[in-house]
């Protein structure tokens, strides 16, 4: 008997695991809140916020990662911010899982 696997949509992303979808919903709420607090008229503050968020691994699902990417692209457009000052976004633990050997 073949059971259909459930799917969960969050912010345009499709998840097959409920746990990941729940995490993505939490991250979506966090992103909404952060968007009200991050002042894009102050790139230095955006850079500090962005780097701290990356260092603390606040986001682990595509929902949060896409927000970080949006901030990263914004920062790269600021002429006086060095590219080397903008941390890369880690994705090794996407969905909160370690990469597993097959």
Protein language model regions, located:
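Intrinsically disordered, low-complexity linkers and terminal regions
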Residues: 1-102
């Amino acid at each position: 008997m073949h059971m259909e696997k459930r799917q969960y949509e969050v912010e345009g992303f499709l998840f097959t695991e409920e746990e990941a979808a729940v995490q993505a919903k939490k991250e979506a709420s966090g992103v909404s809140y952060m968007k009200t607090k991050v002042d894009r008229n102050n790139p230095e503050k955006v850079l500090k916020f962005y780097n701290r968020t990356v260092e603390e691994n606040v986001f682990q699902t595509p929902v949060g990662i896409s927000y970080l990417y949006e901030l990263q692209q914004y920062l790269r457009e600021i002429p006086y911010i060095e590219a080397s000052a903008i941390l890369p976004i880690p994705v090794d633990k996407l969905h909160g899982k370690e990469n597993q050997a097959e």
